[in-house]
Amino acid sequence: MTQVYNFCAGPAMLPVEVLRRAEQELCNWHGLGTSVMEISHRGEAFMQVAAEAEQDLRDLLKVPADYRILFCHGGARGQFAAVPLNLLGSERTARADYAVGGYWAQSAAKEAQRYCNPHAIDIAQRVDGKLSMKPMAQWDLLEESAYLHYCPNETIDGVTIDEEPDFGDRVVVADMSSTILSRPIDVSRYGLIYAGAQKNVGPAGITLVIVREDLLGRARREIPSILDYQVLVESDSMFNTPPTFAWYLSGMVFKWLKEQGGVSEMARRNQAKADLLYQAIDGGEFYRNDVAPANRSRMNVPFQMVDSALDPLFWDEARKAGLHALKGHKVAGGMRASIYNAMPLAGVQALVAFMADFARRHG
């Protein structure tokens, strides 16, 4: 069978070692004669899975002791609502800053309008025709706000903010759905981090939340219990039946990451993959990327061709070559290669070779 590399923005490629182990264990997990999908989430066996997953994630990100880790439902969009409902309290006139650099940050700000009057800050700018993000020192924040929300990596436009926040006592909330575990971060600089699993963590269906303990217990009275961080903490993320298989697979990914050398090693690999792909894009006139180098994403690399009429042919030929899901988002068009942790260097090398051949034949 032809080697297939999945460049989808999410659900994304999973480590092949994890998939093979899951295949081996699928019908007889730990000698129990049943699948992990069929056991009680409150039984001793699965509680051990949950405990190990939490500890492994804590180890990988060096999560401080005064932060709680939750495994939730609802994806990042669920957190778009959960964040204001948990952090704004009962005062409906409370304000929150939303730094908007792309589609997902804008979506979070739009959802927040249901619960407050968010202060949206446009941090995107064009410099010499290239999309870039304003430095954090230039963000026009309110003097008093309940929190600052931003998205460090925007998957559609392929922009990243590597600068870590330094806003004193201000509560910083980050949507790290597409960048978590791809590089080291200082968790103590954030009040709350959330991430949908389907890019760098595991399969779709589970969402990570890392929340500082002093932010618990602030939720509005009318918040749905399933979104209340305090309720989830008190129930060990099992207020209702959790997505156990996604939790189990995410835990396996955490163990795989530790075996590979942790997030520092992932950062090294991801930089190497991104450098190779951007060099291929910048190396001629056939392809282009419209993001300023300082803000180019290492996770999601969009690019266009000199003649957009060739796009469908590129997608089709790439798929036949085992390079799947390279069609750009409908908002941006063109091509997009998502190269998360599980994408091996060989996958990017195969893509770069295909791009060179395609340009030679159609340039």
From Swiss-Prot:
- Positions modified as N6-(pyridoxal phosphate)lysine? K199
Could you list this entry's UniProt keywords, alphabetically sorted.
Amino-acid biosynthesis, Aminotransferase, Cytoplasm, Pyridoxal phosphate, Pyridoxine biosynthesis, Serine biosynthesis, Transferase
Q: Which cysteines are joined by disulfide bonds?
A: none
GO-annotated molecular function: O-phospho-L-serine:2-oxoglutarate aminotransferase activity; pyridoxal phosphate binding
Q: Does the keyword Transmembrane helix apply?
A: no
Where, in this chain's numbering, is L-glutamate bound?
R42
CDD domains per UniProt: PSAT_like
Query: Which reactions does this protein catalyse?
Result: O-phospho-L-serine + 2-oxoglutarate = 3-phosphooxypyruvate + L-glutamate; 4-(phosphooxy)-L-threonine + 2-oxoglutarate = (R)-3-hydroxy-2-oxo-4-phosphooxybutanoate + L-glutamate
Primary residence: cytoplasm
Task: Tell me the pathway.
Answer: Amino-acid biosynthesis; L-serine biosynthesis; L-serine from 3-phospho-D-glycerate: step 2/3; Cofactor biosynthesis; pyridoxine 5'-phosphate biosynthesis; pyridoxine 5'-phosphate from D-erythrose 4-phosphate: step 3/5
A Gene Ontology biological process noted in the UniProt record is: pyridoxine biosynthetic process
Q: Which GO terms describe its cellular component?
A: cytoplasm
Its subcellular locations are: Cytoplasm
Residues binding pyridoxal 5'-phosphate: A76, R77, W104, T155, D175, Q198, N240, T241
Fetch the InterPro entries from UniProt: Aminotrans_V_dom, Aminotrans_V_PyrdxlP_BS, Pser_aminoTfrase, PyrdxlP-dep_Trfase, PyrdxlP-dep_Trfase_major, PyrdxlP-dep_Trfase_small
| EC number(s) on file | 2.6.1.52
Cofactor dependence is on: pyridoxal 5'-phosphate
Describe how the cofactor binds. Binds 1 pyridoxal phosphate per subunit.
Q: How does it assemble?
A: Homodimer.
Q: Which family does it belong to?
A: Belongs to the class-V pyridoxal-phosphate-dependent aminotransferase family. SerC subfamily.
Q: What does this protein do?
A: Catalyzes the reversible conversion of 3-phosphohydroxypyruvate to phosphoserine and of 3-hydroxy-2-oxo-4-phosphonooxybutanoate to phosphohydroxythreonine.
What is the protein name stated in its UniProt record? Phosphoserine aminotransferase
What is the species listed in this Swiss-Prot or TrEMBL entry? Answer: Edwardsiella ictaluri (strain 93-146)
From the UniProt record, report the name of the gene that encodes this protein.
Answer: serC
